[in-house]
Amino acid sequence: EVKIPSCVKEIGSYAFSGCFWLHSIDFDENSQMKKISELSFVGCLSLEKISIPENVDEIEEGWCHSKITNFSISEKNKNFLFHQEKILLGKSDKNIEKFDSLLFAKRSIEHVIIPSFVNKICALSFYLCTNLKSVEFEEKSELKIIGKSSFNRSTLKSIIIPSSVVCIEDKAFLMCNKLQFVEFEPNSKLKII
């Protein structure tokens, strides 16, 4: 277990890289944490618990490569939303009101419906979701980008890609050994795979 002191404002890239036996991250009360950088917890495959403090206003793509099952966010944090207790949503720009980026999915999920207002599934969002069977998108999806390795090593079986998607980044479906069905909606705007 690691308890981050209240004076720490940022967790840098690779800060806990390879900490295989790390099980939980806690933050002191009155935490001043503002940013969790990309790849902060890469290789922390035993990490199961983290609670995001209220002052965090930036979580970078690919911040977490773990099997977190106990995830929470301070009710006072207005920058992120744990939607349906399954997916972490954030804002791509602090000046906008809507949560338009999907940053993380609870590793135990089997099925998820992604809200229409999400325009990017960020890198590694569904990485190691070993119970995932299907992903659906609400009607009139605004999704534009499926990020790098976003479904890497998941057990996704089927997906219908919304017509709004213009880019599927590198390794988005790498090692999806159970993937049997991929369909693109009519009038697809896809330009890059």
Language-model regions, residue ranges each:
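Structural signature of tandem-repeat unit edges
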Residues: 1-10, 20-35, 44-58, 66-97, ...
